[in-house]
Amino acid sequence: MTRPRLPLMRAATRLAALALATAGVLLTVATPASAAVPTGRYVALGDSYTSGPLIPTQVDLNCLRSNRNYPSLVAASAGSSSFADVSCSGATTDDILYGGDGALGITLPPQLNAVTSNTSLVTVQIGGNDIGFSGIIGDCAEASVSSPLGSPCKNRYTAGGVDQLQARIAAATPKVTAVLQAVRRAAPSARVVVLGYPAILPDTGYGCWPVVPIAYQDVPYLRGIEKSLNAMLANVASANGATYADVYTPSIGRDACKSSGTRWVEGLVPQNSAAPFHPNARGEQGMATALLARLNS
């Protein structure tokens, strides 16, 4: 199915218009230690948090995919007999099930096509774009300029007494369910692991405006939205016989407000090679370590 997607680079350009400069630092990332994980065919499905946009080395410009993202690190550590990383920046659940267009406008088949009957491990990290992640960040960053101490973003998304973002999470639930059920049909014997999302904002307090341009009173609100999304993913995984890998907890204290040498997720102006508000190489390493630990538990 060819359809318009929310191009990550368009969203990044919108955010970058708020910034005065950018900086990039190439990280050296160590491969995680070996773990007792499935060593057969491994297929990685997901969005930009999986693909690793702008993290060197980019091996697929249509999907902005790095060969140092967490699936690549896990596959190397596990010694997977074959490996297919079909994650793609901007992907939604529809892209997994039906296909869509990449960042360069090149049409892609369904990510699900990579899952074969002999697949032994499938990882899935999806849902952020189903709720409109890039648009939310852009809206909230722009709104913060006029009310940095207030809650302009929360006010917008809860106007009329209905939390639109919680409603989006609820609407995404059956879509994630459909993905997991399709994966199970395609690979009945595979171990399926659903990953949540790492901390973008501090786990406590009111953030670090203007370094991360989210208004102070909006930080607790958006933090709660991310936790609700992760909780939904955990619940759907459990209900469909999949394992949930928590990457939020190990990322606490490594959010976008932290120093460039500590953070897993970049802010508006990346100080490490990564897209704005996306994991850097350290974040991909951290998610790989968390995934391996979960597989070995």
Language model region names:
Residues 41-46, 50-51, 82-87, 120-125, ...:
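Structural recognition of the beta-strand scaffold that forms the well-ordered cores
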Residues 121-124, 147-184, 193, 197-244:
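Conserved N-terminal glycine/acidic-rich loop preference
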